[in-house]
């Protein structure tokens, strides 16, 4: 069992049950899945870029990424419908908790000029989105092996009904949210 999964089961459930006033253990919010997405629009000109992006994503997540394709043609971006333009990975269960552990304790502290995560990035239904500008904050990525620095989007989907419940859940996992000053 992953370290954060055990922490959730032993500590977080009881904390949130008291704080949110949940009647049942099953009513306590939990993390459903984590989705990682890299959009590589520059891959239109060079197909090798997409292979490198998918390799980076596989090393970061520990899972083979799925190719994402353009839904419709956009002349301004010089892309056609159904062209490969990025990749994504959906993590659940044990792999999700292991990635979350690495994200909170290793990757986020390595972000340059980090002042905390924005508490405004919730979507209104308790899910959290964050963007990362550099994939080199993850220890799995070797700085000498990358061809370009790329960002990614990380979406944490929870069963929380409101942003306050979602934020309470992520704070219980020690997410470094920015405090209002």
Curated annotation (Swiss-Prot):
Disulfide partners: none
Pfam families for this protein: Ribosomal_L5, Ribosomal_L5_C
A GO biological process held by the record: translation
InterPro entries assigned to the protein according to its UniProt record, in alphabetical order: Ribosomal_uL5 (IPR002132), Ribosomal_uL5_bac-type (IPR020930), Ribosomal_uL5_C (IPR031309), Ribosomal_uL5_CS (IPR020929), Ribosomal_uL5_dom_sf (IPR022803), Ribosomal_uL5_N (IPR031310)
SUPFAM superfamilies per the UniProt record, alphabetical: RL5-like
UniProt keyword terms in alphabetical order: Ribonucleoprotein, Ribosomal protein, RNA-binding, rRNA-binding, tRNA-binding
GO molecular function ontology, one term from the record: rRNA binding
GO cellular component: ribonucleoprotein complex; ribosome
Family membership: Belongs to the universal ribosomal protein uL5 family.
Alphabetical list of PANTHER family matching this protein: 60S RIBOSOMAL PROTEIN L11-RELATED
NCBIfam families noted in UniProt: PRK00010.1
Subunit and partners: Part of the 50S ribosomal subunit; part of the 5S rRNA/L5/L18/L25 subcomplex. Contacts the 5S rRNA and the P site tRNA. Forms a bridge to the 30S subunit in the 70S ribosome.
HAMAP family given in the database record: Ribosomal_uL5_B
Protein's job: This is one of the proteins that bind and probably mediate the attachment of the 5S RNA into the large ribosomal subunit, where it forms part of the central protuberance. In the 70S ribosome it contacts protein S13 of the 30S subunit (bridge B1b), connecting the 2 subunits; this bridge is implicated in subunit movement. Contacts the P site tRNA; the 5S rRNA and some of its associated proteins might help stabilize positioning of ribosome-bound tRNAs.
Protein name, entry field: Large ribosomal subunit protein uL5
Gene: rplE
């Amino acid at each position: 069992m992953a370290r954060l999964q055990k922490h959730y089961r032993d500590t977080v459930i009881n904390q949130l049950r008291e704080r949110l006033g949940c009647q049942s253990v099953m009513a306590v919010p939990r993390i459903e899945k984590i989705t990682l997405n890299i959009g590589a629009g520059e891959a239109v000109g060079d197909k090798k870029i997409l292979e490198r992006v998918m390799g980076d994503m596989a090393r970061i997540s520990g899972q083979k990424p799925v190719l994402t394709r353009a839904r419709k043609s956009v002349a301004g971006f010089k892309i056609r419908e159904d062209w490969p333009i990025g990749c994504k990975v959906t993590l659940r269960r044990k792999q999700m908790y292991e990635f979350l552990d690495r994200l909170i304790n290793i990757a986020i502290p390595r972000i340059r000029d980090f002042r905390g995560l924005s508490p405004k990035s919730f979507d209104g239904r308790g899910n959290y989105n964050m963007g990362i500008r550099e994939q080199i904050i993850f220890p799995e990525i070797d700085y000498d092996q990358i061809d370009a620095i790329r960002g990614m989007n990380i979406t944490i989907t929870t069963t929380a009904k409101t942003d306050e419940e979602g934020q309470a859940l992520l704070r219980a996992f020690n997410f470094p949210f920015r405090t209002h000053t």
